[in-house]
């Protein structure tokens, strides 16, 4: 073996080490991005599930209020009908009927909106819609994290193989997929598109 051959082998080895180091560093960065994407996807699904439950609870409470409100309206209407059927009712009984009708109507009206405790139908509907909006946002985020995880996992495999096989094309393919995974991760958090 001549000195020139030895020098060429050393240069090839140094170039190979440089490519391996670059691939290893890229794998490390992509593994970190993969962990962040996985965390984001997990949190998005938890949030979507939680907000869906809260929206369902708010709608159920709304329906219960609506049923109670309807019951009071029906009771008031029934008492009004009884009052109309009995024009000769004594004054005390008539006053009691009118008082009860007024109470029922006030309660039914109060159920429409209760800003003091935020449990009126209007407030419950607004709360349910807000939970739905948050749920929908989380549902829009989740697929981006899934895309990111897939792209990043494949990129890491390609980069690992590029080290073993010393194939630059695999490094570049892994880098492109890794970049796509990174962009998908960022979009999962911020929903740019």
Give each language-model segment a name:
Residues 57-131:
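Long, solvent-exposed extracytoplasmic domains/loops
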Residues 16-24, 135, 139-148, 167-170:
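Membrane-interface helix-boundary signature
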Residues 1-26:
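N-terminal positive-inside, membrane-proximal cytosolic segments immediately preceding the first
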């Amino acid at each position: 073996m001549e000195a020139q051959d030895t020098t060429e082998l050393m240069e090839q080895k140094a170039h190979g080490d440089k490519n391996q180091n670059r691939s290893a560093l890229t794998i490390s960065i992509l593994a970190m991005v993969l962990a962040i994407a996985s965390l984001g996807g997990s949190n998005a699904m938890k949030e979507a599930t939680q907000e869906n439950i809260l929206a369902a609870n708010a709608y159920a409470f709304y329906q219960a209020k609506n049923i109670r409100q309807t019951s009071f309206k029906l009771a008031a209407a029934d008492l009004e009908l009884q009052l109309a059927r009995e024009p000769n009712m004594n004054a005390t009984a008539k006053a009691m009927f009118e008082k009860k009708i007024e109470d029922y109507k006030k309660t039914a009206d109060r159920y429409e909106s209760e800003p003091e405790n935020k449990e009126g139908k209007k407030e419950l509907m607004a709360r349910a819609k807000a939970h739905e909006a948050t749920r929908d946002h989380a549902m829009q985020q989740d697929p981006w994290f899934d895309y990111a995880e897939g792209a990043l996992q494949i990129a890491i495999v390609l980069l690992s193989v590029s080290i073993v096989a010393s194939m630059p094309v695999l490094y570049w393919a892994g880098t492109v997929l890794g970049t796509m995974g990174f962009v998908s991760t960022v979009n999962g958090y911020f929903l740019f598109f």
